[in-house]
Amino acid sequence: MRSRNGWRRRRTAEAVSFLLETSARLCFGRAEDNPMSAPQNKAVIVGAGPAGLTAAYELSKKGQRVVVLEADPQYVGGISRTVEYHGYRFDIGGHRFFSKSREVEDLWTEILGADMLERPRSSKIYYRGTFFAYPLKPFEALSKLGVMESALCVLSFLRARLKPVPNPKSFEDWVVNEFGTRLFRIFFKTYTEKVWGMSCKDISADWAAQRIKGLTLGAAITNALLPKRKPKDRKQVVKTLIDTFRYPRLGPGMMWEACAEKVRALGGEVLLGRSVVACSFDAASSAWTVTARGAEGVLEEFHGEHLISSMPMRQLVAQIEPRLPDTALRSANSLRYRDFLTIGLILRERNRFDDNWIYIHDPNVKVGRVQNYKSWSPEMVPDPDYCCYGLEYFCFEGDGLWTMRDADLIALGAKELEQVGLGAAADVVDGCVIRQPKAYPVYDDDYQQHVGVIRRALAAHCRNLHLVGRNGMHKYNNQDHAMITALLAARNILAGENKFDVWSVNEDGEYLEAGQAGEQSTGGAKRTTTPDKDCNDYSPVRGGKLG
C-alpha cells in the first residue's frame, strides 16, 4: 500500500511538472528560446554605416552571430553610401579613403582589394570670383588677393601671434589665434557659418581643434616653398597636404556593400528597411531586445547579449526601456544636429573643372561646396560626354531649403552653378536631390555637458551597451574614426570586459587634418575610464597609441 501511494505521488508530481513546463513553453518558449535567458545574437547592431558594419564584420570573423538593422530600405553605408540615379553615382559628402590607422587601411584593402583606386587630390576655394588652391599656396594667394590685402593679412596674423585670445572657447577665437582676423574672415567665416547655420562665435573651439589643428600657416608656406618629393612610405604623407588618396571604383558605398556581403557570408544578418523604435534592457540577464518597424509597419523583435548603437544619441536615449532619468532625457533633447542635401546635376561635358571639390566662400549663394564625381572616379559617370556635379547645401530638417520641391532645388543648383562660374545652367540635362538628416552633430557651447550627463546615465543603467560612430557618440568622427570606435567596441565584447576606451579615439583633435597615413595601431587604446566628479564628462586614462 505504501509503495502504491509513493508511485501515485511520483506520477502526480511528474504530471504537475509536465503541465508547468508545457505552460511555460506556451507562454515563454523553451529556456533556450527565451531571449532574456539565452540571446540569439552576440550583438544587435543598429545602423549599417561604417561603424555598424565594421563592428559586425569584426565580430563575425570571430565566429559571433550578429544582426545589423538599417533604416534605409535600399542602401547600406549611411552617409558613406553611394546613391545611383540613371546610372550616375553620387558620393554623399565626399569620402577620401586615407587613414592614420594602418589597420583601417589594411581593412579597406581586405574588403575591396583591386577595386580601390589611387586618385589625385585637388581642392579649391572660391572667394570673390577667384579660385584659390587648397591648401593655400602663399604666392598664389599673394597674387590673387593683391599686395595690399596680403600685407594686411600678414599684419593681422602677426598681431594674433603677439596678442592671442587667451583660452579660446569658440571656433572664431581659435582660428583667429592661428591665422589672424583677416584670414579668418576671408577663408573660414563664410563657409563655416554656411555649414553650421550659426555664428562662428557660437561654435565650440573643439570643432577647430578636430578639423584644422594641423593646418597651420607655417605648414602651408613650407609645403609651397619646398620641392615636393614622393615619399618612400605612404605612412609619411601628412593628410592635409596629400597629393593622392584611395577611392572605391564605384564610390564609398561599394566598400560597405562589399562589407555587408562579407558579414552575410560569415553567417550574420544585415537587414534593410528596419527602423528601430525601442531598445529594451533586461537587468537580470543584461540582455537587449530591440524592436524595429519593418515593411508595411510590421514590428519585429531582435534579441542580443550586447547592443551596439550608431543611431543618433538623442534617438537612442528616447527609445531605451526602462526609461532613463529625466536629466538624461533633457540632455538628449538638447543635442542638436545639422542636416544637408545634395543636388546632383548631370550636364554636358564642356568646361568641366578637374578638382574633387570646391569650397564656395561666397555669401551671395547658398551652395557650400561643389563636387565633381568624375574626378573621384571616372566610373561614377557612365557617359563620357557628360559630367556629374554634386552641390551641397547645409540646412536644418524642416526649414525652407529642406522642404523645397526637388524641381525647384534643381533649378536653384543650376542657377548657382552658373553664378560661381562652374557651368552653364543651359547645359544641365537632368538632376536629382538627396537629403541627409542628422549629417553633423552640432558642437555648441553645451554639447559636452549634455553628452557627459547621458554617458553617466547609460553607464549606471545599461550594461552591454556600446556607442560607436559619429552620431552614436555625438562626435564629429570621420569614416576611419567611426571604424576604429567599432573595432574597439567589438574587441571589448570579445574580451568580456571594457579593455579599450572608444571615447579616446580622436579625443585630442590631432588626427582629422594632421594625421600620417597608417602610422598608428588601433589596438593600443587601453581603456581605464572613470567618472570625473568635478566635470560633466569622463576622464579617460589611456596607454599606448590610438588608431
Predicted regions and their residues:
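Active-site-proximal substrate-binding core of FAD-dependent oxidoreductases
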Residues: L494-L546
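Active-site/ligand-binding neighborhood in enzyme catalytic cores
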Residues: T54, L152-L155, R159-F281, S285-W288, ...
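C-terminal segments that line or cap access tunnels to active or ligand-binding sites in enzymes
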Residues: G294, G304-H306, S310-I484, R491-S504
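Glycine-rich FAD pyrophosphate-binding loop
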Residues: S60-T82
